[in-house]
């Protein structure tokens, strides 16, 4: 569970943030100054890394939010088991099963022996691309 903290005002499009316990990639940020004595508010729209679900966060720009630390690794596909793939990390030689991605551009390149890039975020792993 590796996270950092930053303020909502420091978030940029393309950065990552935790919303409702789910790591998300920020796709839109709008900031608005409210009232005479109110503080500026930000509306952050983000898409979940694992679910693909759209999530939003409305908060003051000086509020602290969690930012997940994304660890990028390279692995090799050992076996295709239908819905799952057996992957070997090329640094630690650890083997593990990952769910097969749903993106067509990744699925079309999946074959045993192919090198992949996968991300490890908050104890979960996801295949990002096939090299």
From Swiss-Prot:
Disulfide bonds: none annotated. It comes from the Archaea. The keyword Protein biosynthesis applies. The N-terminus is blocked. GO terms for cellular component: cytoplasm. PANTHER family: TRANSLATION INITIATION FACTOR 5A FAMILY MEMBER. Functions by promoting the formation of the first peptide bond. This is Translation initiation factor 5A. It comes from Sulfolobus acidocaldarius (strain ATCC 33909 / DSM 639 / JCM 8929 / NBRC 15157 / NCIMB 11770).
